[in-house]
Each structure stands twice: as C-alpha cells, then as structure tokens.
C-alpha cells in the first residue's frame, strides 16, 4: 500500500505516473521535524536504496545528499555523485519504503550525526512524501516502480560489448579498434565516440576533417555489426552561424539570468548557453536536434555534463580575473596563496552559480537551484520523447551521466568518472541493486576505470563483474594507459570472458526484460531473495542477478580467490575463460566457503531448482546479431525438475508485451527438457 502526504505547494517533477493515492492524515513510522523527518533505528535495521552513491549496499553510517554533482573522485568522503535518487527502504523492526518527491536538495543522514537516528532533511517545505508498505522488500520495490513507471528498454544490441575512450580521434582509429577486436576473437557491438568527434565541441555536429563521410562510416561500421554511439553535452556553444545556438536564442529556448538575458557558463567549447530543459517547447526543440545524427545512421547516444556541469559562470570568471590582478601585485604568503588557489578552484560547479539562472516551466519561472536535480532527467527525456516521435517503432540506445527518478523511463545511466582503483569494482557492485530499486535497470560502470592508469589484472577482474551488468562498456580518460582488452598479454582470457558475456545473453536479456515489464529488479541484494536469512542481510559483496544466479566477484589485487556465503545449497559454475570457456560444476552446501578464482576464471552460483539458458558456439560470436536466442543450451541444478519463463523478442521494436515473447521451458527429474517455442539442450 502506498500513502501520500503533501507539504506546501510542490513543483511537479513528473517523476510519478501512478494513479490517485490516498492522502495520509498522520505519518506512520517517521517523526515530523521542522525541516523534514526522523526515525529511531534499532541495531539490526538496514537501509537500502538511494541509487548511485558511495559506500555499501546498506547505507547506514553516512550522510548522503540528493544533489546532482559533477565530481569524478568517488571516495568514501563524498556525500553526492551525479544523480538524485530519493527512494530508500528501512528494513528491520519496521519495514517500509520512503520516497521524497522534490527537485532540490534532500539530505539523508543515515546514522551519521546520531548513530541510531535516520534524519531526512528537505531544503524547502514544498514536496510530496510517499510511504510504501508491502509484504516483502521486493513487493515494496514493485509498488514503488509501478508508481514511477516502466523502466527504459534498450535495443538488444545494447547488451553487447562496447569500447570507449576519450577519445577515438578519427575514422581510422575506430577502424583500428574494430579490427583488433575481430582479429582477437573478442566480440564487440559498439564503439563510443567522445567529445572530439564534434566540430569544436558543438552539439549535433561532426568534425569534417576527422570524420569526412560520417553517414557512410556509420553504415560501414554497421555492416560489421558495430554501432557508433556519440556523446551529446548539455551546453550549446555561443557562436554566430551555429544553427542550434541561433535557433535557441531566437526562440528563447535557453536558461536565463534574472534579467531575462541568456545565462552564460563555460564548458568544453568555452562560453555556452544551457537549453531550458524544463520548458516543454525548448525540450521538444532540443530533442528534435538528435534527428541530425539519427539521419546519418546513428542508433545510440550518451548524454554527458548534464548535472549541469559548470567549468565557470561568466560573471564569477570576470570577478576572478579582477581579483587575480590584485593578487599579482602582492607578495603571496601562505594565507593569501591559499585564498588565491581556493578562489580559482571554486570556479567550477560553484553552488552559488546554480542560483544565478532560471527556467520557464509550466508552473512558472523557477530559479535553477530549486529544481536542480531535474536538468539531466529532462535532457534525456528530451531525447527519449524525440525518439518516440521520430522512430516510433524502433528502440534507440540512450544513457546519461546525471539522473533522478523519472529519467529511468527514458534511458539508462553509466556511473560516471570512476577510477582504476580496486575499490571501485566493489563500489560498482554496491551501486547495482540500489539503482535497480530506483528503476535504473540499464546501468554499468566504466570497465577498467576512467581515471588513473589501469592494470591487466584489474581489467580482467572488473570484467568478472561487468559481464553481468546490462551496460558493458570499457572507457578511459585522455592521458591514461590504453585499456582495450586486446592490448594486454593474456588475450585468450579476455576473449573468453567477453565470449562468456555473449553466452549469457539469453539469460541476461530475459531477466532484464522481465524486470522491466513486471516492475521488478534485475539485480538485488541477497536479503531480497533470502528474507529469512539474517546473515544475508550483512553480505555486502555478493548480489543476485535475476532469479537464478548469485555472483561474488573478486575485487582485491593479487587475490586468487575469496570467501563466499551461500544462503542455500547451490551449483558452483566455474568457467575457464582461457580454455574456450570450459565449464566445471560442483554442488556446494549452504554456508561459508573459500572459492579459488584464477585470473582467467569466472565463478558464479546457480540456485537449486533453477535453470540457466545459454547461447551456443561462443567462439563464432562477433556481435549480438550472431547470438541465436531460440537455440539454447540449458545449464541446470534441478534434481527434482524445474521450470523457467524465458523472454525473447526481436530486440529492435517497441512491441514488448506480446504473449508470444514469453517461452516456457521445463525440465523433469530425469533431465528431459522441453519448450513450447525454443530449442533447448541440457548440459548439466
């Protein structure tokens, strides 16, 4: 049951799509405070949710701010990253969900100030509070997801492997990447283009020197099973003769200063205006710009810098230059030097600059900071709504850096500018179920790490987790070590682990689609699947993938294995990636186990009484198009028989809901499998 309580006059975020809900007279569970709510926690209480954030699956012990922030240092001391996800579940003596529908800053003090107290602070008394009660943790998530709407469904090829870099500078560099993947039997479905494909960093342009025949090049790549996925940034360059800029100025489609003139900030191209994503006309106009690239054969995009990131606001920059002139005349001691460097550092993403510009919304003129968390959501919404108009029968790939709840209906996310740190493998695992709770099923980290120099073993171990995330993308920053998998010594292991991803695709795609269509979770904490198991509530480095698999990746350097907790008897599945993905299986009882895992191995666990559909002929697969989703191998641990509801479709159209997409597979106690519409062969 979902209950709603309104405070003040909230801005309609359009995050909620559910029908009328009963208004609460009194608030259950929470104590009303002048600036929010509090809840007295018991020692056994666990806090789940809050989407993409630092620290563990259990959010107790830290303070989190819902404030979309451009911050590439994802360390434990941070309180906010790129998104705002105001949904959490308290699980313990009371079990309930909380959603704060508010577009500005919300603080979740999860036992940081007071170890035993959850405090939720809202910047203004204009918001909707939702309390969700359910029969289980998964039921609470299900009800919440029905409230906020169906999760984004990408094309099937978007579940393939993607290779990215800041930046592949021209056509020949992209061709080289594809050729090396193919030469080393490493499947690949997409090459991602960062900012240097553009003409002087201008949105919806292509540099004619680097990509002289872009449409022909996109067709050339698609003929090899490769899609190009270009980046789109939030800022529009101020340049006479640039059509996007001139149209935006002419029609008043940009965010404005208090006096109504277009607000000026600096990002990649220098001085830019920000499209007013909260103005419906401006949003539709910006979305229509994607047609320029769609018409050239592009079928996928990623939206970046859409918190929005601000290198500098023009007015602050002017004041900074003036102050620098004053400092230039001084003998800088330690205090004045610190003030000088601090002044320059405060140019970027300064909170005060977000109070300088305004949006023209359906609900009137709004200062940006009061609706800050909606910008990235509505940039991706602009694209998603345009795709529905321009390509009504076709799925287009879209993922974003910034997001809040509501955006999950229009695209996925990648989890931003992580680092080549071992701790960030574990952080990526922590984020997966928390994002799933909030509706963001299509998500993934930068495999190998974006910042810093990576190592071969780190990339291999990261793929050991990444092959289970819906978005599988290797990405790294300009100036760092190149980390395409074919550049490392152990090419057979990399080829095997990427082929394993494609062997798993029938299961991964089926579980993703069922989660999206049924408002469920593709990835969940162990406690969601095993609610009666007290120890499962404490496990922070294992998750469930779909209904059948438990994964426990290795995330420490030089480790040749790890301890794993199994809540029930399971089948250990060991894949020898360097040996053509040879599979070894053994049954393990419930409890704690030390599991050896060599660098070229992937180990996961199949639940008793469950089935795992796999593709065939991994060595022949170069892209998702080579996977036969109707001709399956079946891995099973089902001494008493089992059944599985398998989903598959054409992977291209938006016609998701047909009953014929669901295929029933059964396995009897004698090991005989049958299916109404798929060919299956039992292997274990």
Task: Please describe what each predicted stretch is.
Residues 150-164, 261-274:
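N-terminal small/glycine-rich loop or linker at the start of catalytic domains
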Residues 73, 374-375, 380-396, 402-413, ...:
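Catalytic core of carbohydrate-active enzymes
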Residues 1-155, 165-166, 171, 178-183, ...:
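Catalytic and substrate-binding clefts that recognize carbohydrates or anionic sugar/phosphate headgroups
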Residues 77, 97-99, 107-110, 139-141, ...:
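Short helix/loop capping segments that flank catalytic or ligand/cofactor-binding pockets
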Residues 64-68, 81-84, 175, 283, ...:
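Short, hydrophobic/amphipathic alpha-helical packing segments
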Residues 187-494, 529-530:
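Aromatic- and carboxylate-enriched substrate-binding clefts and catalytic-loop regions
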Residues 82-86, 93-95, 103, 126, ...:
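Extracellular structured ligand-interaction cores
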Residues 89-94, 257-259, 567-568:
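Short acidic-glycine loop/turn motifs at beta-strand connectors
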């Amino acid at each position: 049951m979902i209950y709603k309580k309104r405070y003040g006059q909230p801005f309609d975020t359009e995050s909620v799509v559910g029908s009328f809900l009963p208004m609460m007279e009194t608030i259950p569970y929470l104590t009303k405070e002048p600036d929010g709510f509090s809840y007295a926690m018991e020692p056994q209480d666990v806090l789940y949710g809050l989407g993409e954030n630092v620290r563990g699956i259990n959010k107790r012990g830290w303070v989190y701010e819902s404030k979309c922030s451009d911050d590439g240092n994802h360390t434990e001391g941070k309180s906010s990253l790129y998104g705002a996800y105001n949904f959490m579940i308290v699980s313990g003596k009371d079990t309930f969900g909380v959603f704060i529908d508010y577009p500005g800053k919300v603080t979740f003090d999860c036992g940081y100030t007071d170890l035993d107290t959850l405090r939720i602070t809202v910047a203004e008394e204009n918001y909707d509070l939702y309390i969700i009660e359910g029969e289980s943790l998964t039921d609470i998530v299900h009800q919440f997801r029905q409230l906020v709407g169906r999760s984004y469904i990408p094309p099937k090829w978007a579940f393939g492997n993607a290779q990215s870099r800041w930046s592949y500078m021209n056509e020949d560099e992209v061709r080289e990447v594809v050729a090396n993947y193919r030469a080393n039997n490493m499947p690949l479905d997409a090459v991602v283009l960062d900012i240097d494909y553009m003409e002087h960093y201008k949105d919806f342009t292509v540099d004619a020197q680097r990509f002289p025949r872009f449409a022909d090049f996109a067709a050339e790549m698609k003929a090899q099973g490769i899609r190009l996925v270009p980046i789109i940034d939030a800022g529009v360059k101020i340049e006479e003769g640039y059509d996007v800029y001139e149209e935006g100025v002419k029609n008043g489609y940009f965010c404005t200063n208090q006096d109504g003139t277009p607000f000026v900030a600096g990002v990649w191209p220098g001085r830019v205006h920000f499209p007013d994503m909260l103005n419906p006309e401006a949003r539709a106009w910006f979305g229509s710009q994607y047609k320029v690239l769609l018409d050239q054969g592009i079928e996928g995009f990623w939206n970046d810098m859409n918190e929005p990131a601000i290198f500098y606001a023009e007015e602050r920059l002017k004041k900074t230059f003036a102050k620098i002139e004053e400092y230039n005349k001084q003998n800088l001691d330690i205090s004045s030097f610190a003030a000088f460097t601090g002044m320059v550092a405060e140019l970027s993403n300064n909170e005060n600059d977000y109070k300088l510009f305004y949006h023209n919304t359906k609900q009137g003129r709004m200062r940006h900071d009061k609706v800050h968390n909606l910008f990235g959501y509505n940039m991706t919404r602009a694209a998603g709504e345009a795709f529905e108009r321009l390509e009504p029968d076709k799925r287009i790939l879209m993922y974003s850096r910034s997001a809040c709840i509501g955006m999950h209906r229009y695209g996925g996310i990648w989890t931003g500018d992580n680092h080549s740190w071992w701790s960030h493998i574990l952080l990526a695992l922590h984020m997966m179920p928390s994002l799933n709770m909030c509706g963001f099923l299509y998500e993934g980290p930068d495999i190998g790490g974006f910042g810093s120099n990576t190592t071969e073993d780190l990339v291999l171990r990261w793929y050991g987790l990444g092959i289970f995330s819906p978005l599988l993308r290797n990405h790294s920053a300009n100036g760092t070590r190149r980390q395409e998998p074919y550049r490392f010594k152990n090419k057979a292991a990399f080829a095997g682990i990427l082929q394993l991803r494609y062997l798993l695709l029938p299961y991964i795609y089926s579980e993703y689609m069922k989660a999206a269509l049924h408002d469920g979770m593709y990835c969940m904490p162990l406690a969601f699947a095993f609610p009666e198991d007290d120890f499962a509530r404490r496990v922070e480095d294992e998750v469930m993938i779909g209904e059948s698999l438990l994964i426990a990746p290795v995330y420490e350097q030089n480790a040749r294995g790890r301890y794993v907790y199994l809540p029930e008897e399971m089948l250990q599945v060991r894949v020898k990636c360097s040996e053509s993905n040879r599979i070894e299986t053994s049954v393990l009882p419930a409890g704690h186990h030390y599991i050896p895992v060599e660098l070229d191995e992937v180990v996961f666990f199949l639940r008793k009484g469950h089935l795992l559909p796999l593709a065939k002929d991994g060595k022949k697969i170069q892209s998702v198009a080579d996977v036969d989703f109707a001709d399956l191998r079946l891995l099973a641990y089902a001494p008493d028989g089992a059944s599985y509801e398998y989903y598959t479709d054409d992977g291209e159209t938006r016609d998701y809901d047909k009953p014929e997409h669901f295929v029933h597979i059964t396995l009897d106690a004698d090991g005989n499998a049958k299916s109404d519409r798929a060919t299956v062969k039992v292997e274990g």
